[in-house]
C-alpha cells in the first residue's frame, strides 16, 4: 500500500483558497440538471464524489461541458424530472451526496434504474429514505441486503404525507426536500427523532431558493412543499469553498501558527462547518472573521467538552487537535460518525491510540487524553479522506507521522498534502 511520511512541522503560516464545497457542488449539479435553462457553476469541486454525480447525470442524458481544470461546469437543465431511456445502472462509488439525492430524484416519473456503488456504500444505511419514498408512492427494491444499496428504482413518487427519520443522516431529508417540488402532489414531510447536522438542511434550503423554489419550514420538524413546481436556473452560481476542508488548515494555525487564513468561506457562508472556528476559539486560538475569509492564530489550547451534532465532519478535526490541548477532550452526540465513509468513531479511536492517546470510545461520544509525547505510527485511513487529513496534524509535533493510502483525499481534496507542505516550515 502506498504511504506518505510527514516529517515534523515547526510552523504553519499563510493563506489558502479552498476548493469548492462537496455538499454544495453535488446539490447544485442536481438542481441545475432538474432546472429550466442553462447554469454556469464556478469553483466546482473536482473530486471523486463530484465525478460520480457528473457521470450519473451524463448517463441520464444531461449535457454539460467542463473547463480544463474541471472547476467550471456549463450545464443545460432538463426542465423537470430526469428520465432514463430504458433500464440503466448507475455506479456511484462511495458518494453519499450522489446516492441519497439521486435515489429520491429518480423516483419521479417512470424509470427503471439501479443505483449501486463500492462495497462500503453497500454498508451505508439508506432504509429510512426508502421508507419515506415508499410512503410517497415510490416503487423501490433492495437488490442485496435489506435497508442498504444497491437499489432498483421504478418511479411512482407522487408526494403526500411523509415521515422521515432525521437521526441517522440529514441527507435523507435533503433528498426528499429537493425532490418534493417536482412531485405532482403537495408533500408534507414530518421529521422523527433528533435531526442530525441541521446546518446541512440550511444548505439545501438555500440552494433550492437560489433555483427558485421556497418551502415552508416549521422549526425543522415539518416541511410543507407545493407540488408541480419547476426549478429555474439562476444563470451563474459560485460554489463556496469547502468549510470541512478549511478545518485542517485552521486547526494547524491554532496548533503551530503563525496565522493561517482560509478564503472562499467567511461569516456569510451557508455551511454549518464554519462554526468549527468557534470551537477552536473556545480551545484558546484567536479567530478573525471576514465576509469571505477566516483566519486563525495560534493560542495555548485547552480541552473542551461539547455536543458536536451540528458539525459532525469538522468535529473529526477537533479529535486530532485534542492531541495538542491541555486536559481531556470529550466530543458528544456524534453517532452519525458511524455511518459515514467508514465507522469514524471506531477508526478515530483506534488510530488515536496508536499515537499514544488514551481514548474512550462510546456509542455516540469519544473522550481523548493526549500523551506527554506523541508516538510515530502508521495511520490507517480506512479509505476515508477525512481520516487522512485529520491525522496529518500529528506532524505538528516533534514526531513524524505515516499516512497509509494518502490518495484517499481525492474524495474532496486531491492536492491536500501539497497545500499543507506549501504552508509548512519543517522542524
From Swiss-Prot:
InterPro entries (alphabetical): Enolpyruvate_Tfrase_dom, Enolpyruvate_Tfrase_sf, EPSP_synthase, EPSP_synthase_CS, RNA3'P_cycl/enolpyr_Trfase_a/b
Task of the protein: Catalyzes the transfer of the enolpyruvyl moiety of phosphoenolpyruvate (PEP) to the 5-hydroxyl of shikimate-3-phosphate (S3P) to produce enolpyruvyl shikimate-3-phosphate and inorganic phosphate.
A GO biological-process term: chorismate biosynthetic process
Active site (UniProt): 313 (proton acceptor)
PANTHER family (alphabetical): AROM/DEHYDROQUINATE SYNTHASE, PENTAFUNCTIONAL AROM POLYPEPTIDE
EC number: 2.5.1.19
Name of the featured protein: 3-phosphoshikimate 1-carboxyvinyltransferase
Alphabetical list of Pfam families matching this protein: EPSP_synthase (PF00275)
GO molecular-function terms, A-Z: 3-phosphoshikimate 1-carboxyvinyltransferase activity
Residue sites binding 3-phosphoshikimate per the record: 22-23, 27, 169-171, 197, 313, 336, 340
Main location: cytoplasm
Binding site for phosphoenolpyruvate: 22, 96, 124, 171, 344, 386, 411
UniProt-listed NCBIfam families: aroA (TIGR01356)
GO CC annotation, single: cytoplasm
Family named by the database record: Belongs to the EPSP synthase family.
UniProt-listed Gene3D superfamilies: Enolpyruvate transferase domain (3.65.10.10)
Keyword Acetylation attributed: no
Organism: Salmonella paratyphi A (strain AKU_12601)
Amino acid at each position: 500500500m502506498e504511504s506518505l511520511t510527514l516529517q515534523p512541522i515547526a510552523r504553519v503560516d499563510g493563506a489558502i483558497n479552498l476548493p469548492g464545497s462537496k455538499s454544495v457542488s453535488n446539490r447544485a449539479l442536481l438542481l441545475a440538471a432538474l432546472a429550466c435553462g442553462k447554469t454556469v457553476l464556478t469553483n466546482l469541486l473536482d473530486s471523486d464524489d463530484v465525478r460520480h454525480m457528473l457521470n450519473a447525470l451524463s448517463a441520464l442524458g444531461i449535457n454539460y461541458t467542463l473547463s480544463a481544470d474541471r472547476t467550471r461546469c456549463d450545464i443545460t437543465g432538463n426542465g423537470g424530472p430526469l428520465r432514463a431511456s430504458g433500464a440503466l445502472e448507475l455506479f456511484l462509488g462511495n458518494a453519499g451526496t450522489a446516492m441519497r439525492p439521486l435515489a429520491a430524484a429518480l423516483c419521479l416519473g417512470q424509470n427503471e434504474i439501479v443505483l449501486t456503488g463500492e462495497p462500503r456504500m453497500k454498508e451505508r444505511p439508506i432504509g429510512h429514505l426508502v421508507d419515506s419514498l415508499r410512503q410517497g408512492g415510490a416503487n423501490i427494491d433492495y437488490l442485496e441486503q435489506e435497508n442498504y444499496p444497491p437499489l432498483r428504482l421504478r418511479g411512482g413518487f407522487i408526494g403526500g404525507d411523509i415521515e422521515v427519520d432525521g437521526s441517522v443522516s440529514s441527507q435523507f431529508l435533503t433528498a426528499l426536500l429537493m425532490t418534493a417540488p417536482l412531485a405532482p402532489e403537495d408533500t408534507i414531510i414530518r421529521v422523527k427523532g433528533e435531526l442530525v447536522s441541521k446546518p446541512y438542511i440550511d444548505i439545501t434550503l438555500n440552494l433550492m431558493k437560489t433555483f427558485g423554489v421556497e418551502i415552508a419550514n416549521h422549526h425543522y420538524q415539518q416541511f410543507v412543499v407545493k407540488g408541480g413546481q419547476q426549478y429555474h436556473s439562476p444563470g451563474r452560481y459560485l460554489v463556496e469553498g469547502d468549510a470541512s476542508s478549511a478545518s485542517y488548515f485552521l486547526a494547524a494555525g491554532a496548533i503551530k501558527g503563525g496565522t493561517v487564513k482560509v478564503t472562499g468561506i467567511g461569516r456569510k457562508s451557508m455551511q454549518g462547518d464554519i462554526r468549527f472556528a468557534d470551537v477552536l476559539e473556545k480551545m484558546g486560538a484567536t479567530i478573525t472573521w471576514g465576509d469571505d475569509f477566516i483566519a486563525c492564530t495560534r493560542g495555548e489550547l485547552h480541552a473542551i467538552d461539547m455536543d458536536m451534532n451540528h458539525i459532525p465532519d469538522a468535529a473529526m478535526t477537533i479529535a486530532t487537535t485534542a492531541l495538542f490541548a491541555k486536559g481531556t477532550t470529550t466530543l458528544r452526540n456524534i453517532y452519525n460518525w458511524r455511518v459515514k465513509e467508514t465507522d469514524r468513531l471506531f477508526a478515530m479511536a483506534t488510530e488515536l491510540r496508536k499515537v499514544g492517546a488514551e481514548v474512550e470510545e462510546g456509542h455516540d461520544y469519544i473522550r481523548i487524553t493526549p500523551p506527554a509525547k506523541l508516538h510515530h505510527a502508521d495511520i490507517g485511513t480506512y479509505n476515508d479522506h477525512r481520516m487522512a487529513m485529520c491525522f496529518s496534524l500529528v506532524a505538528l509535533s516533534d514526531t513524524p507521522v505515516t499516512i497509509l493510502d494518502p490518495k484517499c483525499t481525492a474524495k474532496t481534496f486531491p492536492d491536500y498534502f501539497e497545500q499543507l507542505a506549501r504552508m509548512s516550515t519543517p522542524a
